[in-house]
């Protein structure tokens, strides 16, 4: 039999009447869990700032058509009336979430965090006078709440008088008031905890239980809330029409540019001077164009994690970062080691690193001790003032000075990945068989299986900014919001191994003996490219390397001139670009992926001679080398899905920056090192800042439109893949993504309709 609990509720003249309540625990727990699972499906996960990942703001509504989802959400948000009691409930919920979820910003850690949010709330809420207002009855009620959050939800639903048929709707409404905090908790429970147990466990069941308890105390008539007044959806429908017009205009323009290039796709050139494989990121497109104009260079596009699902521990780091798309689980742990250097340099580095740790620890202790902060200010105030002056008036000089001081104290050393399987520590490294398998798959996916140049560069990317909570949003999304240079260096190291090359030759990929692979990193803020070649043991043609470096520097200059037009600067292009990366007051160091519009899966010959204006994700692909469509299948179900997340985040952050973005950076406050709030207490903002999508308050820089995917491959192959994968059916048939196929034989353009039919585009 199911066990039962009895909840004794007292009566007072000033409180709501409370009655005795009996119910079966097991049955109710299952019912509540099922309801919560249903209502949380529409909550979009929110990634923390350190690994800020673009995600569709309406991810939970993708089962609807794009138009239906937008109308439903816009109408609901605009029809929500202001309610003072609701704001009080929100304020308390923000306080509890901020305290529990904090990861090092707070001076004093919330007690009982290791037992979970609900347990911690149970223990501490009776001491929160701002919540219970020292009312004895309320304090007694708080002290006698059930131990399980599901039981608390049932208790509160009954206390609020929510009818059974309305309970799921009521829970959905409850979650919708703070979607940012709810989304972050969803990320913790569904994404962060995929690899093990969470140190401070929390779930949306806990979140709902705590919120409903607070609601019972501060807003007991919440169930009687006036229904949201549905605003006429005419404005939203007009918005959708505007988006459609932009999409039609852009598609017509893009296909018009591609049409004359169709006859050039099969033209094969001679052996290139060097080949560079860039991330598919839209910021790579103009830089690739610039470097190709300077010599006989070939560039390719591939996901910036270079096909390696790894976690990487930095040489100086104490944390391990997942350097692969969030859709994948890291399979391998990789460490770094110092490249052979003189013993004195390594010793100096280690001592300097330890000295900086001690200095930081002492500073933190003095800063947060009850008696020493004033003395700290008195002793360091003048130096802090000088630092602030330099960073404000001469940011480039200030950064250079900081770098020089760091080099004096702790000289930097070059590192290389340790990827060989460790027999003593088997969870570290990659076996030889897996090295071969991942290297082959990467080369086939990027279309680099023959005609290798003497020098092949895998170029990851990252950004360089100051005082920017959203710094990871400018890094590589395919690397989980981290910089991609280490993945590039890792794949290059694997492909330089003789044993790997021999195995690849047996599988039909013959890499010439004089071909050398190197990793590199493209700084998308300044367009600097750093090539990592110190760990390469093979002979590198120094003339080619020197010429490539000179051409990369010229490409940087040319691309800066192109980019500066969009940044509205009157200064010298290169000087202003560098200043933006060093200036701690700069709200727009770069435009990121703003204006992204299309995802092109095709050989580079199709787009090489076209100015795509930095608006296209470019993934290299040769359908003639993919008879069964497995390579295209991977491209459409992985990188294209990530591109759609990016596209929709920019789209929704533009059309409603308050609801789906994060507002102006000027009023941001970092909360618990996990996200930002507007002011001192708001929902956790979960989209892009105003400055990332708007030229100014009234004019958008990003053009909101859905992703246009263009695939150079026969329709029958594409149709088979769409039928095979539900995610593709959802995105294409619900019109979250538009798909155009270019037939390689007839050179006709076809559009995939939501009815699963193809129509010719004329």
Swiss-Prot record:
Family affiliation: Belongs to the inorganic carbon transporter (TC 9.A.2) DabA family.
Localization terms from the record: Cell inner membrane
Pfam families: DabA
One GO CC annotation: plasma membrane
Cofactor: Zn(2+)
Gene field: dabA
Keywords linked to the UniProt accession: Cell inner membrane, Cell membrane, Membrane, Metal-binding, Transport, Zinc
Molecular function via GO: zinc ion binding
Main location: membrane
Subunit structure: Forms a complex with DabB.
Function field: Part of an energy-coupled inorganic carbon pump.
InterPro entries referenced in this protein's UniProt entry, alphabetically: DabA
Keyword Metal-binding listed: yes
Mode of membrane association: Peripheral membrane protein
Name the UniProt record assigns to this protein: Probable inorganic carbon transporter subunit DabA
Source organism: Legionella pneumophila subsp. pneumophila (strain Philadelphia 1 / ATCC 33152 / DSM 7513)
Binding site for Zn(2+): 279, 281, 461, 476
